[in-house]
A protein has these predicted regions:
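Positively charged n-region of N-terminal signal peptides that target proteins for export
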Residues: 1-5
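Long, charged/polar, soluble alpha-helical segments
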Residues: 22-187
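Bacterial N-terminal signal peptides
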Residues: 7-17
């Protein structure tokens, strides 16, 4: 690199200092939709239906913060905090947006496994698990639709609804679950 090029770059940075800061501001404003311990749980959980279970747990934690409702005992809350970290924080729009992103990531996980092995027996199980949670999410977020106070909230609710609808549509295409016989019928 020549001195002339360096001089030109420095001059541009002095003239447009906001351009240099733009990258750091965007990174600082980026919000991760999982806590650090949730990410660790996801990385450790390689079996599809169990991994989707971690996504479902992450969604349930955000719904608990949004609604303020909990049915967990103090012992269960302590165990969850050890496994998944502190409950997530943020505005209502942030938490609803997190749920939309988590649903999207769960869809991607199922799609990835399906692309590699269409006949994987865990796909229907994982999809049904996710569909049950998607249905619950839509039901619990309905009151928030009328209370939405910002465009970000409205957009987040729309994203969640769209993801939930695609999950439910895919689950409706599944054949009925096969009942597992724990014991063979005796003749």
């Amino acid at each position: 690199m020549t001195i002339r090029n360096l001089t030109l770059i420095l001059a541009l940075l002095l003239i447009f200092p906001s351009a240099a800061k733009a990258g750091t501001i965007n990174r600082a404003q980026h919000r991760d939709h999982f806590t650090e311990l949730e990410v660790e749980q996801i990385k450790e959980t390689q079996i599809l239906d169990k991994r989707i279970g971690v996504f479902v747990k992450a969604i349930a934690r955000r719904l608990r913060v949004l609604t303020g409702a909990t049915t967990d005992t103090a012992k269960q809350q302590k165990k969850d905090a050890e496994l998944y970290g502190a409950l997530p924080t943020g505005s209502r729009a942030d938490l609803i947006g997190d749920i939309g992103k988590i649903l999207d990531e769960a869809i991607t996980n199922i799609d990835d496994v399906s692309a590699r092995d269409e006949k994987n027996p865990l796909i229907p199980t994982a999809l049904r698990l996710l569909a049950n949670e998607a249905k619950r999410v839509v039901e619990q977020l309905q009151p928030f639709q009328s209370q939405a106070s910002s465009d970000a909230e409205v957009a987040s609710i729309e994203q969640v609804t769209e993801n939930a609808e695609s999950i439910l549509a895919a689950a409706n295409k599944l054949p009925p679950p096969v009942a597992k016989d724990k014991k063979k019928k005796q003749e």
